[in-house]
Swiss-Prot record:
A zinc finger (CCHC-type) spans 292-309. Necessary for the splicing of pre-mRNA. Has a role in the recognition of the branch site (5'-UACUAAC-3'), the pyrimidine tract and the 3'-splice site at the 3'-end of introns. Keywords: Metal-binding, mRNA processing, mRNA splicing, Nucleus, RNA-binding, Spliceosome, Zinc, Zinc-finger. PROSITE patterns: KH_TYPE_1, ZF_CCHC. Residues 1-28, 86-110, 189-210, 305-455 are annotated as: Disordered. Residues 153-236 form the KH domain. This is Branchpoint-bridging protein. It comes from Candida albicans (strain SC5314 / ATCC MYA-2876). Pfam families: KH-I_KHDC4-BBP, SF1-HH, zf-CCHC.
Length: 455
């Protein structure tokens, strides 16, 4: 087989893609007076590899910063990316929009952004190396910052219906305070939407600058160590994820915050757990109105007394089942009922029994004897002639005490017996006197004259 008219294709040119980290591979890397291996040939554990990588990167960043300071160059010119020309294979990332402070100076230049990023990375690595490497010595030009600042942006544009500010602050700021206590960092909400319209931003302190207000909504986290900042970022992200991914009606965080707010306001109403037995017992005690039938109109749900067609007459066939029982609210006494009245006496059969049963009227009391001075030696003749007025009539006797019919009956019977005895005795004496006088024939002697009669 011939290859006429064709030239054999040679191997493609070996041209490696250039990047900002391009360069000749080196066996050793020199950072100042120290030399580090770039190829690991020994047997190391994963922890040892991580510790060596942290130590190597810390020394590399420290070398870049010290060289830029000694040569009075920009940190951008010291980095390896400065030696690579902009080609189609490598293009620099676009710069963010410029930001200015209150004096008009730009705060987010390229040099400043790169320096802050390198210092932040070195600070985090130093913290990790100090906790994992025994007898670790920090670089000589390293100065631990007094505080570390982190901005965590909130996805308000993606989820405009969620009130991130309200949930992060919580009822009376308790949620934000709890996040600060758990993480040990200081959290502040900054950016657009952090301040209500019409209110001043002076209440947020001096850190709320014009740049922070114009920035997107974010949580400003400040702490003295990266560990606290990472913990605060984790806690804030957990709250944001709960708000985003919680289904409708299952937002337990909102329920807990509303309950906490009710406790603070004093309007909480505790709900008891559902007890099916108590609910069933309560339903049994209640009257089922579907079983109540009116006897007038025949409808269900009311009794005949409450019927609109009732003209004030109660139907005769109204059962006690349809009428609710009324409770007698009168006070009950423990006094026994009075004894029954005695039976009426039998009618008398003779006149003697009638005379025995009916007591005679009591005799009138004798008139009081008038004194000599008041009467003036009055005699019967004066009374007869009307010279001296008669004495006043006696007062009426007091009414007899109220007694029972049985006691009155017994007393009346006793009085009748005693009077019958007295009458029988007086009649016997009278009969004996009359018999004696008639036998002798002597008339009875007249009564002696009164001493008061004048001579």
């Amino acid at each position: 087989m011939s290859n006429r008219g064709r030239q054999p294709s040679g191997p493609p040119p070996s041209r490696k893609r250039e990047t900002k980290w391009s360069g000749k591979p080196k066996r050793y890397a020199n950072f100042g007076a120290q030399s580090f291996d770039t190829v690991i040939t020994g047997h190391l554990t994963q922890e040892q590899l991580d510790a060596y990588q942290r130590y190597f990167r810390i020394e590399e960043i420290s070398n870049f910063l010290s060289v830029a300071k000694q040569q009075h160059k920009s940190i951008v010119d010291v980095l390896p990316s400065a030696k690579v020309d902009e080609t189609d294979h490598y293009k620099r990332d676009p710069s963010p929009p410029p930001k200015y402070d209150k004096n008009g100076n730009r705060t987010n230049t390229r040099e400043r952004r790169v320096t802050e990023a390198l210092e932040k990375e070195r600070h985090e690595l130093v913290e990790l190396a100090a906790s994992s490497i025994k007898n670790y010595m920090i670089p000589s030009n390293y100065r631990r910052p007094s505080r570390t600042v982190e901005r965590l942006y909130v996805p308000v544009k993606d989820y405009p219906d969620i009130n991130f500010v309200g949930f992060l602050i919580g009822p009376r700021g308790n949620t934000l305070k709890k996040l600060q206590e758990d993480s040990g960092a200081r959290l502040q909400i900054r950016g657009k939407g952090s301040v209500k319209e019409g209110k001043s931003s002076d209440g947020f302190g001096s850190s709320q600058t014009g740049t922070d207000i114009q920035d997107d909504l974010h949580v400003l986290i400040t702490a003295d160590s990266p560990l606290k900042i990472s913990k605060a970022v984790k806690l804030v992200n957990e709250i944001i994820d709960k708000l985003i991914f919680s289904p409708q009606g299952m937002n337990f965080m909102k329920r807990d915050q509303l309950k906490e707010l009710a406790v603070l306001n004093g309007t909480l109403r505790e709900t008891k757990p559902f007890d099916p037995e108590a609910h069933e017992k309560k339903q049994q005690q209640q009257m089922d109105i579907t079983k109540i039938v009116c006897k007038i109109c025949g409808n269900i749900g009311h009794i005949a007394r409450d019927c609109k067609q009732n003209n004030g007459k109660r139907p005769l066939d109204d059962n006690a089942e349809n009428e609710p029982t009324t409770i007698n609210k009168k006070a009950r006494t423990d006094v026994p009922p009075p004894p029954p009245p005695p039976p009426p006496p039998a009618p008398p059969s003779s006149s003697t029994e009638i005379s025995k049963q009916v007591p005679p009227p009591p005799p009138p009391p004798p008139p009081p004897a008038p004194s000599a001075a008041a009467s003036g030696f009055a005699t019967t003749e004066n009374y007869k002639q009307g010279l001296v007025p008669p004495p006043p009539p006696p007062p009426p006797p007091p009414p007899p005490p109220v007694r029972s019919a049985l006691v009155n009956f017994e007393n009346n019977s006793k009085v009748l017996l005693t009077k019958e005895k007295e009458e029988s005795g007086s009649s016997e004496l009278k009969n004996t006197g009359e018999s004696s006088s008639s036998s002798s024939g002597v008339p009875p002697s007249p009564p002696p004259p009164s001493s008061n009669v004048p001579r």
